[in-house]
Amino acid sequence: MASKIGSRRWMLQLIMQLGSVLLTRCPFWGCFSQLMLYAERAEARRKPDIPVPYLYFDMGAAVLCASFMSFGVKRRWFALGAALQLAISTYAAYIGGYVHYGDWLKVRMYSRTVAIIGGFLVLASGAGELYRRKPRSRSLQSTGQVFLGIYLICVAYSLQHSKEDRLAYLNHLPGGELMIQLFFVLYGVLALAFLSGYYVTLAAQILAVLLPPVMLLIDGNVAYWHNTRRVEFWNQMKLLGESVGIFGTAVILATDG
């Protein structure tokens, strides 16, 4: 009996560490995909979302925070720094007005950014640590969970009001309109769980099971988004990487919620 409990605990710790790895490496992929995206825009004489001098500082801060988080050095502080860096860069890109996106694409982009910020706040609370030396900050974790709830509300909203998202689900998931409504209800229920703070572990477990097929069939269908909906290739790859980071957050909360 004791060996079964020990093996189960070991497995949960291993899965939790996997979630931490996916989340802490997310900024590396974000910086790489942004560099590739802005290189493509430079060839077409188009501007990046953030002016170039500030862009280098922004990416430097992201890589610095991601490096320390990955090595587990002052992870809580650098997770908080990563959340702040991402919030500032997103705000700067939004008010800069250098690139204009469609409303449906803004919802996809900014909702994922909000979820990643929430993931960093969850990490800054002390969740996902194998050997916790300090007590967990429940306020930071609750705030991160609220951000995840906001992301899920945006996904549910897109399923009802964005024809681009609806077609992505209709074309690549069986069940047609009924499946869309089931996903809408499921996203809404999960959002309520994260926003209220009740049944968070169960909601995170469901989300961790739900996200991989959605990432594979919806976000991973680059041909649909790039060729049909004219989303820039590396922008879609960045969104896909953020979905992986959100999955990592769900895994952390599912195993250490």
Curated annotation (Swiss-Prot):
Listed InterPro entries: TMEM101 (IPR029371)
Compartments, as annotated in UniProt: Membrane
Membrane topology field: Multi-pass membrane protein
Record-annotated disulphide pairs: none
Principal subcellular localisation of the protein: membrane
A GO CC term attached to the entry: membrane
TM region positions: 21-40, 52-72, 77-97, 110-130, 139-159, 182-202, 206-226, 233-253
Entry's Gene Ontology BP terms: positive regulation of canonical NF-kappaB signal transduction
Pfam families from the UniProt entry: TMEM101
Methyltransferase keyword on record: no
Keyword Transmembrane belongs to the record: yes
Domain of life, per lineage: Eukaryota
Keywords assigned: Membrane, Transmembrane, Transmembrane helix
Function according to Swiss-Prot or TrEMBL: May activate NF-kappa-B signaling pathways.
PANTHER family, alphabetized: TRANSMEMBRANE PROTEIN 101
Name assigned to this protein: Transmembrane protein 101
Organism: Pongo abelii
